[in-house]
Amino acid sequence: MQFSTTPTLEGQTIVEYCGVVTGEAILGANIFRDFFAGIRDIVGGRSGAYEKELRKAREIAFEELGSQARALGADAVVGIDIDYETVGQNGSMLMVSVSGTAVKTRR
């Protein structure tokens, strides 16, 4: 499965548009990691705990996106948009949402 943020894939022709596909992942952030991440952010360091959670959520969202595309018989997803949000009480959860158009291609 190929993923692209662009509307086309270089060297390939889109032969069929299968439909819009989406993938979402919402992960709760551990309160102790949140506390220490906040301290590191204050002193200018990077928050490895948040980065790890965002990476995990993004991977899950892309897996879901690919599964939906495969179910439609697609071999690629183009025009992908990736959104990151904090949700829940006091932003206690991380959400990654990806969407795009599932397509069938030919070289």
UniProtKB/Swiss-Prot annotation:
UniProt cross-references to SUPFAM superfamilies, sorted A to Z: YbjQ-like (SSF117782)
GO CC terms: plasma membrane
Source organism superkingdom: Bacteria
InterPro entries: UPF0145_dom_sf, UPF0145_YbjQ-like
Coiled-coil intervals: none
Family: Belongs to the UPF0145 family.
HAMAP family (UniProt xref): UPF0145
Name of this protein: UPF0145 protein YbjQ
Organism: Escherichia coli (strain K12)
Lineage, opening ranks: Bacteria, Pseudomonadati, Pseudomonadota, Gammaproteobacteria, Enterobacterales
Gene behind the chain: ybjQ
